[in-house]
Amino acid sequence: MMHLLADPETWVAIAFVILMGLFAYLGVHRMVLKALDHRADRIRDELAEAKRLKDEAAKVLADYKTRRASAEREAEEIVTSAKAEAERIAADAKAKMEDFVARRTKAAESKIALAEAQALADVRAAAAEAAVQAAATVLSQSVKGGLGDDLVAKGIAEVSRKLN
Protein backbone atom coordinates (compact mmCIF):
# COMPACT_ATOMS: atom_id res chain seq x y z
CA MET A 1 0.00 0.00 0.00
CA MET A 2 2.90 2.25 0.53
CA HIS A 3 3.63 1.94 -2.94
CA LEU A 4 0.27 3.43 -3.80
CA LEU A 5 0.89 6.42 -1.58
CA ALA A 6 4.08 7.20 -3.40
CA ASP A 7 2.34 7.35 -6.73
CA PRO A 8 1.27 10.94 -7.68
CA GLU A 9 -1.82 9.74 -9.52
CA THR A 10 -3.11 8.29 -6.28
CA TRP A 11 -2.84 11.64 -4.56
CA VAL A 12 -4.58 13.30 -7.48
CA ALA A 13 -7.40 10.76 -7.23
CA ILE A 14 -7.66 11.25 -3.45
CA ALA A 15 -7.72 15.05 -3.89
CA PHE A 16 -10.36 14.68 -6.55
CA VAL A 17 -12.58 12.52 -4.34
CA ILE A 18 -12.16 14.95 -1.42
CA LEU A 19 -12.94 17.89 -3.68
CA MET A 20 -16.03 16.16 -5.03
CA GLY A 21 -17.15 15.33 -1.53
CA LEU A 22 -16.64 18.93 -0.49
CA PHE A 23 -18.60 20.11 -3.53
CA ALA A 24 -21.40 17.68 -2.67
CA TYR A 25 -21.39 18.80 0.96
CA LEU A 26 -21.52 22.48 -0.03
CA GLY A 27 -24.24 21.87 -2.66
CA VAL A 28 -22.22 23.01 -5.62
CA HIS A 29 -24.06 20.53 -7.81
CA ARG A 30 -27.34 22.27 -6.95
CA MET A 31 -25.83 25.65 -7.83
CA VAL A 32 -24.54 24.29 -11.13
CA LEU A 33 -27.92 22.72 -11.91
CA LYS A 34 -29.65 25.94 -10.90
CA ALA A 35 -27.32 27.97 -13.15
CA LEU A 36 -27.93 25.55 -16.01
CA ASP A 37 -31.69 25.73 -15.44
CA HIS A 38 -31.49 29.51 -15.31
CA ARG A 39 -29.51 29.53 -18.54
CA ALA A 40 -32.02 27.17 -20.18
CA ASP A 41 -34.88 29.43 -19.05
CA ARG A 42 -33.09 32.48 -20.42
CA ILE A 43 -32.47 30.74 -23.76
CA ARG A 44 -36.12 29.61 -23.87
CA ASP A 45 -37.26 33.19 -23.16
CA GLU A 46 -34.94 34.54 -25.84
CA LEU A 47 -36.28 32.00 -28.33
CA ALA A 48 -39.85 32.95 -27.43
CA GLU A 49 -38.99 36.65 -27.78
CA ALA A 50 -37.32 35.97 -31.13
CA LYS A 51 -40.41 34.09 -32.32
CA ARG A 52 -42.66 36.90 -31.12
CA LEU A 53 -40.48 39.50 -32.87
CA LYS A 54 -40.47 37.39 -36.04
CA ASP A 55 -44.27 37.15 -35.98
CA GLU A 56 -44.56 40.87 -35.30
CA ALA A 57 -42.17 41.65 -38.15
CA ALA A 58 -44.22 39.44 -40.47
CA LYS A 59 -47.38 41.31 -39.47
CA VAL A 60 -45.69 44.68 -40.00
CA LEU A 61 -44.37 43.53 -43.37
CA ALA A 62 -47.83 42.36 -44.43
CA ASP A 63 -49.32 45.66 -43.23
CA TYR A 64 -46.76 47.66 -45.19
CA LYS A 65 -47.35 45.56 -48.29
CA THR A 66 -51.07 46.23 -47.97
CA ARG A 67 -50.48 49.94 -47.45
CA ARG A 68 -48.10 50.06 -50.39
CA ALA A 69 -50.60 48.36 -52.67
CA SER A 70 -53.30 50.73 -51.46
CA ALA A 71 -51.05 53.74 -52.01
CA GLU A 72 -50.18 52.53 -55.50
CA ARG A 73 -53.87 52.11 -56.34
CA GLU A 74 -54.62 55.54 -54.94
CA ALA A 75 -51.76 57.09 -56.90
CA GLU A 76 -52.99 55.41 -60.06
CA GLU A 77 -56.49 56.73 -59.43
CA ILE A 78 -55.11 60.22 -58.86
CA VAL A 79 -53.12 60.08 -62.10
CA THR A 80 -56.14 58.80 -64.03
CA SER A 81 -58.33 61.49 -62.52
CA ALA A 82 -55.76 64.18 -63.27
CA LYS A 83 -55.49 63.03 -66.89
CA ALA A 84 -59.26 63.06 -67.28
CA GLU A 85 -59.46 66.51 -65.70
CA ALA A 86 -56.68 67.80 -67.96
CA GLU A 87 -58.46 66.43 -71.03
CA ARG A 88 -61.72 68.03 -69.90
CA ILE A 89 -60.02 71.37 -69.28
CA ALA A 90 -58.30 71.17 -72.68
CA ALA A 91 -61.61 70.41 -74.38
CA ASP A 92 -63.29 73.31 -72.56
CA ALA A 93 -60.45 75.64 -73.49
CA LYS A 94 -60.63 74.53 -77.12
CA ALA A 95 -64.40 75.06 -77.22
CA LYS A 96 -64.07 78.48 -75.60
CA MET A 97 -61.30 79.43 -78.02
CA GLU A 98 -63.36 78.33 -81.02
CA ASP A 99 -66.34 80.29 -79.70
CA PHE A 100 -64.14 83.33 -79.10
CA VAL A 101 -62.67 83.13 -82.60
CA ALA A 102 -66.15 82.74 -84.12
CA ARG A 103 -67.46 85.75 -82.19
CA ARG A 104 -64.43 87.85 -83.11
CA THR A 105 -64.77 86.84 -86.76
CA LYS A 106 -68.46 87.71 -86.77
CA ALA A 107 -67.73 91.04 -85.06
CA ALA A 108 -65.00 91.82 -87.59
CA GLU A 109 -67.31 90.92 -90.48
CA SER A 110 -70.01 93.14 -88.99
CA LYS A 111 -67.56 96.02 -88.66
CA ILE A 112 -66.41 95.52 -92.23
CA ALA A 113 -70.00 95.49 -93.51
CA LEU A 114 -70.80 98.58 -91.47
CA ALA A 115 -67.68 100.33 -92.77
CA GLU A 116 -68.61 99.39 -96.34
CA ALA A 117 -72.14 100.73 -95.85
CA GLN A 118 -70.77 103.91 -94.27
CA ALA A 119 -68.25 104.35 -97.07
CA LEU A 120 -70.99 103.86 -99.67
CA ALA A 121 -73.20 106.39 -97.89
CA ASP A 122 -70.29 108.83 -97.67
CA VAL A 123 -69.58 108.41 -101.39
CA ARG A 124 -73.25 108.95 -102.23
CA ALA A 125 -73.42 112.01 -100.02
CA ALA A 126 -70.27 113.42 -101.55
CA ALA A 127 -71.59 112.71 -105.06
CA ALA A 128 -74.93 114.30 -104.21
CA GLU A 129 -73.21 117.33 -102.73
CA ALA A 130 -71.04 117.67 -105.81
CA ALA A 131 -74.07 117.27 -108.09
CA VAL A 132 -76.00 119.88 -106.12
CA GLN A 133 -73.09 122.29 -106.26
CA ALA A 134 -72.68 121.69 -109.98
CA ALA A 135 -76.41 122.14 -110.62
CA ALA A 136 -76.48 125.26 -108.52
CA THR A 137 -73.58 126.70 -110.41
CA VAL A 138 -75.04 125.84 -113.81
CA LEU A 139 -78.51 127.10 -112.95
CA SER A 140 -77.30 130.28 -111.35
CA GLN A 141 -75.28 131.12 -114.42
CA SER A 142 -78.01 130.25 -116.89
CA VAL A 143 -81.05 131.70 -115.12
CA LYS A 144 -80.85 135.20 -113.66
CA GLY A 145 -83.21 137.07 -111.42
CA GLY A 146 -85.83 136.12 -108.79
CA LEU A 147 -87.34 133.31 -110.78
CA GLY A 148 -83.91 131.79 -111.27
CA ASP A 149 -83.16 131.97 -107.58
CA ASP A 150 -86.46 130.25 -106.74
CA LEU A 151 -85.88 127.54 -109.32
CA VAL A 152 -82.33 126.99 -108.10
CA ALA A 153 -83.47 126.73 -104.48
CA LYS A 154 -86.28 124.27 -105.34
CA GLY A 155 -84.00 122.19 -107.54
CA ILE A 156 -81.28 122.02 -104.91
CA ALA A 157 -83.78 121.02 -102.24
CA GLU A 158 -85.32 118.34 -104.46
CA VAL A 159 -81.96 116.89 -105.55
CA SER A 160 -80.73 116.88 -101.97
CA ARG A 161 -83.89 115.14 -100.82
CA LYS A 162 -83.70 112.46 -103.53
CA LEU A 163 -79.99 111.73 -103.15
CA ASN A 164 -79.99 111.52 -99.39
Curated annotation (Swiss-Prot):
Localization: Cell inner membrane
User: Which keywords has UniProt assigned to this entry?
Assistant: ATP synthesis, Cell inner membrane, Cell membrane, CF(0), Hydrogen ion transport, Ion transport, Membrane, Transmembrane, Transmembrane helix, Transport
By what name is this protein known? ATP synthase subunit b 1
- Classify the protein's membrane topology as the record does: Single-pass membrane protein
What does the function comment of this entry state?
F(1)F(0) ATP synthase produces ATP from ADP in the presence of a proton or sodium gradient. F-type ATPases consist of two structural domains, F(1) containing the extramembraneous catalytic core and F(0) containing the membrane proton channel, linked together by a central stalk and a peripheral stalk. During catalysis, ATP synthesis in the catalytic domain of F(1) is coupled via a rotary mechanism of the central stalk subunits to proton translocation.
Query: What top-level branch of life does the organism fall under?
Result: Bacteria
Q: What is its main location?
A: membrane
Q: Which GO terms describe its cellular component?
A: plasma membrane; proton-transporting ATP synthase complex
Which residue ranges run through the membrane?
A: 8-28
Family membership, please give it.
Answer: Belongs to the ATPase B chain family.
User: Subunit structure of this entry?
Assistant: F-type ATPases have 2 components, F(1) - the catalytic core - and F(0) - the membrane proton channel. F(1) has five subunits: alpha(3), beta(3), gamma(1), delta(1), epsilon(1). F(0) has three main subunits: a(1), b(2) and c(10-14). The alpha and beta chains form an alternating ring which encloses part of the gamma chain. F(1) is attached to F(0) by a central stalk formed by the gamma and epsilon chains, while a peripheral stalk is formed by the delta and b chains.
Q: Would I find Transmembrane among this entry's keywords? A: yes
Q: Which InterPro entries match?
A: ATP_synth_b/b'su_bac/chlpt, ATP_synthase_B_chain
Q: Name one GO molecular function term.
A: proton-transporting ATPase activity, rotational mechanism
